[in-house]
Amino acid sequence: PPIKPLVDIPRMAEISRDMVRGSLGALVKRDVEAASRIWQRDDEVDELHQHVYRELLTIMTEDPARIERATYLIWASHNLERIADRATNIAERVVFVCTGHVPTRDEWLDKQLANSG
């Protein structure tokens, strides 16, 4: 039987895939705005990974017979989170290539707040 319903891991895969496509598209088009949007998606994947990690640790604690399967899912989640991080790295370099500056996360968030208000 499945260790848990796989909802978050497929969602992480979808977002990570979209991030890679988005960062590569931003690179090809030299699109700073598209590259900047990648950061927001990275936070979403990070949160999903933390949720999956905590949930699977609980499962392993409650049922040691599931440790091996849960460990494989934790690694899958971790690797998807790293893919999202790599897409973010590409996006940061796109911003640098186009502007000569990579804003800090705080600068980027301030800009997003200013644009939404």
Language model features: what each stretch is:
Residues 1-117:
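Cytosolic, long alpha-helical scaffolding segments
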